[in-house]
Amino acid sequence: SPIIVADEDIENFEMIQKKYVTPMAQDAVKNKSIKQWALIKKVPGIGNPDNKTNYMWVAAFDNINQMVNRENWWSNTEKKFGVPSEVIYDSPDIVRRGRYIYKTEKQIQTDKPGQYVILNWATPTNLNKMIELQGSVEKHFRKNIIKSGMVGWGMATRIVPQNKDLPTAFWWDSYDTLENAYKHLVGQGANEGISKEINEEFNKLIPNGWDNRVIFEFVTGAN
């Protein structure tokens, strides 16, 4: 879920997320309400300055049943901390930019924490062929995952909302440092040595290129 936090509220917002929300997210993971949760923030100075989104809440679920039946775990503040949620969340003001749900199609997970993640959106001309191609991409990335600094990768397809102006596919590339994330963007990192055939097929499936690519930094999370 993308959100906007005013500059003057950032310090207080992150404090609340780390001190209160993260422990409750850890409880939710333990109780099988969610699989993972994270707060990430946009690396400043990149992209369109008119796009004010600067944070995202990211939640992962084991299945649809878990997603639709999960409790509002973030509201358990009084039980856990003795403070009503309306007091904790009274400030700062947060502008929510909607909720977007994806189905993970391919994924690489490691036990190493990622510090930066590249978020990529595109609209393939043939979504099924793109998913199939990601099997070859995954095999290549797994060969380079240690030496490149990549600690996670995945590809997902959009479930909701759906309309003609929204990309249908989403990728994430998680790295240990900002430098290694930038290397990925210029064809190095885990991309290095990928076959010409894979690149050509990928570019053929997204002839207009990426719809959007941004870098976010990990703030806090639970898994």
State each model region's role:
Residues 1-77, 86-223:
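Short S/T/G/P-rich N-terminal loop/turn motif that feeds into the first structured element of a domain
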